[in-house]
Each structure stands twice: as C-alpha cells, then as structure tokens.
Design a protein with these regions (language model features):
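Conserved short beta-strand edge segments in small beta-sheet-based binding/regulatory domains
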Residues: 75-93
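Short S/T/G/P-rich N-terminal loop/turn motif that feeds into the first structured element of a domain
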Residues: 1-52, 56-70, 88-96
Length: 96
C-alpha cells in the first residue's frame, strides 16, 4: 500500500517565501526515488497564498525510513522556525 503525504502552507502575503530545504533533502528524494521507495517526487501546486506539496512513498517502511533521516529532521526544524517567524501556517496530512 502506498503512503501519500501532503504539506499545506498558507502564507500571509505573496511577498513571503517558503523556507529553503537543506540540499541533502533533494539528494534523499532522488536516492529514495531511484531505489523505488518514493514513487512520486514532491509535486507543488499553488492556489493564491496556499502552496501544497504532495509526495508518495512505496509503503510504510519507506516512509519510516524517510522520517527517521537526519536531513528530514533538519528540514522539519528549519521549516518550523521559518514558518513561525514569517506567520506562515502549515499542516502535514497523511497517510491519505
């Protein structure tokens, strides 16, 4: 069973940007995609001030590997600090 997760951000204005993920996050996505552990790389959709990213993992084990990664934890901290400092609300949904 695949695991789909969605991150939804709502910015206070168009002048505010989302955080910049650590470079290692892109490497992890590529590696896990090439290994078949990610079946859909993150897809970004924008609707006004709302931005959504959706990623699909092959199974629960692949997702657990992802969330246990040091670079994912680094990204989580960076995202939280940036969103709090810039009044960006966000939620993580999944599995959906």
């Amino acid at each position: 069973m695949s695991y789909k997760f969605r991150a939804i951000y709502t910015k206070p204005s168009n002048e505010v940007s989302l955080h910049t993920p650590p470079a290692g996050l892109y490497d992890l996505v590529d590696t896990m995609f090439n290994e078949g552990k990610i079946t859909q790389k993150p897809i970004r959709t924008t609707d006004g001030l709302n931005e959504t990213f959706e990623i699909v993992f092959a199974n629960e084990a692949a997702y657990n590997e992802w969330k246990g990664s040091a670079v994912v934890h680094e990204n989580k901290t960076t995202r939280s600090e940036h969103c709090n400092a810039n009044s960006i609300s966000y939620s993580i949904e999944g599995p959906i």
